[in-house]
Amino acid sequence: MKTKQILLLGICAMLLCPTIEAAERWLEGYKKVLVIGAHPDDPETMCGGTMIKLRQMGVEVVSVYLTGGEAGIPGKSHEESRIIRTAEAKKACEAMGVRSIFLTQIDGNTEINKARYAELEALIEAEKPDLVITHWPIDSHRDHRVCSILVYDAWRQSRYSFDLYYGEVMTGMQTQTFAPTHWVNITEQHEQKVKAYYCHKSQDMPLVQEWHDAMEILRGMECHTKYAEAFTKQVWTE
């Protein structure tokens, strides 16, 4: 979707969306947040501004990576790519002031099975977050879908012990049919977010920035600010 089309959608949505003061009230009260992404750079691009804002609010934030980005650098072996991409992710986390954790799945070959559920559930039990943010489940990238399913099922298995929200990554190309329920003003955090995800030097970050800047302008228009990130809350169900 082109930038002009995104801006037009934002203009149409402005009258229906909340003010930023109302939109951000949902962040209040959290003490520990996990952002669980499929690959190095997913948490940073999905909600790096919100992660930075939470840290500024005194909240503990942990960036969790399902894989090490093993398939993410053409011409490199899985092991070479993993070493490079995890190092980049650690630098990005340092730039945001958050802690990083890497799980053991393989980029491009993620699995849903008992062992993978156990790995994620053990992490959540050890960290005890009160908020988890992960991928929206409708996505063109299989690893993103796998990550979302694992987190959703872990949430149900925990008997809803934490709030679960979904974020978006390159909406229209990867995230599909995303309908936000909550927004965060990241105008003051935008520059720091961009610097953080540019730590991923092995990736095409100018393309990512072009895409996410347009998304953040759209989400900002929806809640009457310059840049924003958007989320959808998972409602409790039996």
Residues covered by each model-derived region:
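Bacterial N-terminal signal peptides that target proteins for export
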Residues: 1-8
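Bacterial N-terminal signal peptides
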Residues: 8-18
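Metal-dependent de-N-acetylase/amidase catalytic core
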Residues: 21-36, 76, 94, 99, ...
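ATP-dependent adenylation/pyrophosphate-handling site
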Residues: 31-40, 44-78
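Solvent-exposed loop/turn segments at secondary-structure junctions
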Residues: 40-42, 68-71, 106-110, 138-140, ...
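Alpha-helical scaffolding within the catalytic cores
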Residues: 48-50, 84-88, 118-119
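A conserved beta-strand->alpha-helix junction
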Residues: 66, 93-106
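Glycine-rich phosphate-binding loop and adjoining beta1-alpha1-beta2 segment
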Residues: 70-98
